[in-house]
């Protein structure tokens, strides 16, 4: 078991999260590993904090965020990311956040509790 991943649960709904306080998702493959680990533990829900992603995730020119969104769609997973997002300067990424929050696969929230609530509702 990768030591940075752990299971959480709210209202009987399990999710994968990360116990470290630093970037652990440096490339789309790292995110795929986390999704696979969740699948091994019978959940398609993932809770991360802003700092769990490398800065390149927040730069749309890298394609990193797009690949993560595509993996969520392909594998039917849900992702909640909690953080202040104060270091995100890209207006395009902020637009992506607003649009993503209208859907059901990814949610950007300001608090971890809001992320858990969204992730574990239906």
What are these regions (language model features)?
Residues 2-122:
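Amphipathic, Lys/Arg-enriched alpha-helical "gate/interface" segment within cytosolic domains
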């Amino acid at each position: 078991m990768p030591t940075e991943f752990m299971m959480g649960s709210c209202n009987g709904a399990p999710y994968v999260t990360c116990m470290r306080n630093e970037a652990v998702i440096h490339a789309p493959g790292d995110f795929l590993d986390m999704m696979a680990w969740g699948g091994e533990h019978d959940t398609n829900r993932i809770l991360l904090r802003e700092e769990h992603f490398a800065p390149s995730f927040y730069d749309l020119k890298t394609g990193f965020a797009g690949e993560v969104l595509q993996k969520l769609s392909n594998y039917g997973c849900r992702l909640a990311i909690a953080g202040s997002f104060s270091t995100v300067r890209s207006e395009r990424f902020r637009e992506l956040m607003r649009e993503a929050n209208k859907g059901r696969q990814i949610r950007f929230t300001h608090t971890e509790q809001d992320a858990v609530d969204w992730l574990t509702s239906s």
